[in-house]
A protein has these predicted regions:
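NAD(P)-dependent dehydrogenase/reductase Rossmann-like domain
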Residues: 286, 290-535
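Rossmann-like adenosine-cofactor binding region
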Residues: 54-61, 173-270
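Phosphate/diphosphate ligand-binding glycine-rich loop within oxidoreductases
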Residues: 28, 34, 46-122, 137, ...
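Rossmann-like dinucleotide-binding domain for NAD(H)/NADP(H)
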Residues: 88, 92-93, 189, 226-346, ...
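Conserved N-terminal Rossmann-fold NAD(P)-binding element of oxidoreductases
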Residues: 8, 147-148
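Phosphate-binding beta-alpha-beta segment of Rossmann-like dinucleotide-binding domains, i.e.
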Residues: 88, 96-144, 152, 156-164, ...
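N-terminal glycine-/charge-rich "phosphate-binding" loop or analogous flexible N-terminal tail
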Residues: 1-45
Length: 535
């Protein structure tokens, strides 16, 4: 399959070259497009890669019927309609690590510049003055730096701040305590406790409903007298009016701002007239190295998502809890086990599954959410009118259909790579289990009460029959005469002479006519056909 990618917003050529080098990918590189032009063109592309200048709005996504991936060369994704992308099954991929050092270095450069009055000193020197006595500054050493958001950038700021002899405290309710210990930062239990102790407050969080306006009038009032506020994250985290009032009243010593509520900043914005504010035009990531890094990172991720389906870098897909290559067999197994269960229930007359429960071994604990999404996808494939049903939107689609999704802890299982998918509705239930070790094709090990050992590949026949001589031979003969090649045939029984189950892996498709012929064989009581989609 070949793919078309639209690249815009002047992405670094080193990243674009990685896409161009792939024979299955064709690239159209264009300047930033007006929205109307983007709407007219987007339908023909499988992916778009850009920066913040291009807004990927809900109407753009709805027009993009082929779109699989949106790549953002940078960190912030507030220019992308994430909820719409998720509902449509479009992966959103950013490059959070590529510009880390650029932002960190700008932070220290700007803060030191303000504390040492470097902009004023430079201006006065160029004006022919020698204002040495009026430029008495202050040092970083001994000050308390409060960090809100201890992710990549916050952690790197903390490491370098300690080298300056600063006392570093931080607040981030989503980061494990071990991370605070690793970067040798004092963990604060509330935003208020950080505010009350910070001589310099710096923000390194995404812009979300939770963080919008997070630093307002009340929060600024909690800061010590003559504190410094730094926002190099996203505009809107700091209430600009409240900041301006605190600067005018001299409650704050100053501020360093690189991100604004509305960009570009209006020429007459009152912040521009404040002498104790250092303003930069959102240049946190504006280094040659950072632009190259984020372009390379996002283009690699977009390429891998298109060519191999790897979604580990997607911000709107469930966390896989490890390396994608290690977890991929488990995702495949969960999806295909659900498909097998659905097919068996259909032969029993049940068309509506009400509940999906996934149980997994200890090695897959971190991937539970992704496994559940994959099982939901396997259940729904072929039964819903959804052009892009995948890990990204399968849970939402299932929940919208009233299907209850859950995971169950199974800490005592002997096999750490085991997975069981249990489907139920009304009085009926089926459990399909298997094992999925890294680097090894997954195998089904149990279907209902029957223990089997078969690889779920291409097409799987599940037959129930009486445990009597001749059934296997008749099934094999019928399939052979129909031109269907058997890859594996596993027969299981609960007791001699009772009911048996056959799991037959075959190459290619099995038509409805062949299935009906199987049902007409003596002693065969049911026949289900599961065709596994690639991926």
């Amino acid at each position: 399959m070949n793919y078309k990618v639209l690249v815009t917003d002047e992405i670094d050529p080193e990243g674009v070259a990685l896409l161009v080098a792939e024979p299955r990918i064709s690239v159209d590189e264009v300047p930033t497009l007006p929205k109307e032009d983007l709407l007219n063109r987007i339908a023909e592309y499988d992916a778009i890669v850009g920066r913040s200048a291009t807004r990927i709005s809900a109407d753009v996504l709805e027009k993009a019927r082929k779109l699989k991936v949106v790549g953002r060369a940078g960190v912030g994704v507030d220019n992308i309609a994430i909820d719409t992308a998720t509902s449509l099954g479009v992966a959103v991929i950013n490059a959070p690590a590529g510009n880390t050092i650029a932002v960190v270095e700008l932070f220290f450069g700007a803060v030191i510049s303000l504390l040492r009055h470097i902009p004023r000193a430079d201006t006065s020197m160029h004006a022919g003055r020698w204002d040495r006595s009026a430029l008495l500054g202050s040092e970083l050493k001994g000050r308390t730096l409060g960090i809100v958001g201890l992710g990549r950038i916050g952690s790197e700021v903390a490491t370098r701040a300690r080298a300056f002899g600063m006392n570093v405290i931080a607040y981030d309710p989503y980061i494990a305590p071990s991370r605070f210990e690793a970067v040798r930062v004092q963990k604060m239990e509330s935003l208020e406790s950080v505010l009350e102790q910070s001589n310099i407050l710096t923000l390194h969080t995404p812009l979300t409903d939770e963080t919008t306006g997070m630093i307002g009038k009340r929060e600024i009032a909690r800061l010590p007298q003559h504190a410094l506020v730094v926002n190099m994250a996203r505009g809107g985290i700091v209430d600009e009016k409240a900041l301006l009032d605190a600067l005018k009243s001299k409650h704050l010593f100053g501020a360093v701002i690189d991100a604004y509520e509305k960009e570009p900043l209006a020429p007459d914005h009152p912040l521009r007239s404040m002498p104790n504010v250092l303003l930069t035009p959102h240049i946190g990531a504006s280094t040659m190295e950072a632009q190259r890094n984020v372009a390379v990172d996002v283009c690699i991720a977009v390429r891998d998502a298109l060519l191999s389906g790897e979604l580990s870098r997607s911000i709107n897909v469930a966390d896989v809890g490890g390396q994608w290559s290690d977890i991929e067999p488990a995702l495949t197994l969960a999806r295909r086990a659900a498909g097998v269960g659905r097919a068996i229930l259909a032969t029993q007359g049940m068309r509506v599954v009400q509940r999906v429960d996934v149980r997994s071994g200890s090695a897959l604990t971190g991937a539970k959410s992704a496994l559940l999404a994959s099982a939901a996808r396997g259940l729904l494939e072929g039964t819903v009118e959804q052009e892009r049903l995948n890990l990204i939107n399968a849970r939402t689609v299932a929940e919208n259909r009233g299907i209850d999704l859950s995971t169950t802890e199974t800490p005592t299982q002997d096999n750490p790579f085991s997975i069981e998918v249990r489907l139920s509705g009304g009085m009926q239930e089926i459990a399909v289990a298997g094992t999925a070790q890294p680097g090894v094709p997954p195998r089904l090990t149990r279907i209902g009460a029957f223990h089997v050992d078969v690889q779920p590949r291409d097409t799987l026949l599940i037959l129930t029959n009486n445990d009597v001589p001749g059934v296997i031979g008749r099934v094999g003969t019928l399939l052979g005469e129909a031109g269907v090649n058997i890859a594996e045939y596993h027969q299981a029984r609960l007791a001699q002479g009772g009911q048996a189950l056959a799991a037959v892996s075959v190459d290619g498709d099995v038509s409805e006519a062949i299935r009906e012929s199987l049902l007409r064989l003596p002693d065969v009581s049911s026949a289900a056909v599961v065709c596994f989609n690639p991926g």
